Amino acid sequence: MSLQSYDKDIYDLVNLELKRQCDHLEMIASENFTYPEVMEVMGSILTNKYAEGYPGKRYYGGCEFVDEIEQIAIDRCKELFGCEFANVQPNSGSQANQGVYGALLNPGDKILGMDLSHGGHLTHGAKVSSSGKMYESFFYGVELDGRINYDRVMDIAKIVKPKMIVCGASAYTREIEFKKFREIADAVGAILFADVAHIAGLVVAGEHQNPFPHCDVVSSTTHKTLRGPRGGIIMTNNEEYAKKINSSIFPGIQGGPLVHVIAAKAVGFKHNLSPEWKIYAKQVKANAKKLGKVLISRGFDLVSGGTDNHLILMSFLNRDFSGKDADIALGNAGITVNKNTVPGETRSPFITSGIRVGSPALTARGMKEAEFELIANKIADVLSDINNASLQEKIKGELKELAHKFIIYDKATF
């Protein structure tokens, strides 16, 4: 029986979401469009199989084929990042990070991560996260120019003397200099942990420096710029760390892994290893740069003055509207972004003074610099007359026409 005939409520909502994805311009930096073959294997019979443990060391029988699947995913992941060990079982980036902490830290140990309000992530020690409750967390941030001051990070590290330094961000527009973080970690005897969830797709294409060999441990999601299924991974070159990480994931915080998602990760990694991937990643950066350049020319402020990666941060500190206002107005015009705090923030995290705008999803649809120039001008038009509802409706229609020239899916399920 089909989903449509068995559960029309869910079927209809899934197809409404398909329409939204096709009609709107998805510019949330952490979102992307995965491949049909990735979704196909996620919807396969692999979802039926329990496989507690690791390849060759399972607690259930009948794992001979899923062992091979997981090993393929592991091998492809190692090839992608140029590392010796990989765990492909984490169900999310947050669980991957939790697994790293559980493996290498004791409760109460000090960690030094990027401040959430400056572009870090909840799992880098934010007080509302388990990472900020189980461990004593300290923070570095960016200067008013939106860039990390590595000398300042060194000063903080020497005062704090953390057991672990976390580098990586969810809203940082410049290249992360892992070598400088290595020097800081060595100066204070800290473990260096990189969370590259946002930039992984650029890293594996050579469009951003690789955290290896500088970092002791690296985590990532497999969606975002990698365009795979939703999930997490952990990599290292340290065999002792690898064993501890494996134990921290299973049986530490997870039971049976999601075999259908691990298979989907393997399929995604095959895409990431293809020659076409480098073309995609290069275009992601080019599109983000074009977006930023046009917005600056239209008089808008960008944190750090531009971008080295897949996203820009627009700052409205000098405007009479908020990030939330911009988020809503652009949404009404058919452009999906997210409100975001910015350096020197004066508003609450629920209101903010900025928005985060990314290029990966529209690049996946086939859009290039010409389309991003047009879109940037439409963003500027909306924000220059932010209360003009009729203008928003007009632009929504224009952008829907553009979106329909770059349809990526013709159905909702695979």
From Swiss-Prot:
The modification N6-(pyridoxal phosphate)lysine is found at K224. CDD domains: SHMT. Pathway: One-carbon metabolism; tetrahydrofolate interconversion; Amino-acid biosynthesis; glycine biosynthesis; glycine from L-serine: step 1/1. One of its GO terms (cellular component) is cytosol. (6S)-5,6,7,8-tetrahydrofolate binds at L116, G120, H121, L122, E240, S348, P349, F350. It is found in: Cytoplasm. Its EC number is 2.1.2.1. It is an enzyme of class 2 (transferase). The record marks H223 as: Plays an important role in substrate specificity. GO terms for molecular function: glycine hydroxymethyltransferase activity; pyridoxal phosphate binding. Its cofactor is pyridoxal 5'-phosphate. One of its GO terms (biological process) is tetrahydrofolate interconversion. Pfam families: SHMT (PF00464). It catalyses: (6R)-5,10-methylene-5,6,7,8-tetrahydrofolate + glycine + H2O = (6S)-5,6,7,8-tetrahydrofolate + L-serine. Keywords: Amino-acid biosynthesis, Cytoplasm, One-carbon metabolism, Pyridoxal phosphate, Transferase. Catalyzes the reversible interconversion of serine and glycine with tetrahydrofolate (THF) serving as the one-carbon carrier. This reaction serves as the major source of one-carbon groups required for the biosynthesis of purines, thymidylate, methionine, and other important biomolecules. Also exhibits THF-independent aldolase activity toward beta-hydroxyamino acids, producing glycine and aldehydes, via a retro-aldol mechanism. Homodimer. Belongs to the SHMT family. NCBIfam families: PRK00011.1. This is Serine hydroxymethyltransferase. It comes from Campylobacter concisus (strain 13826). The lineage of its organism: Bacteria, Pseudomonadati, Campylobacterota, Epsilonproteobacteria, Campylobacterales. The gene is glyA.
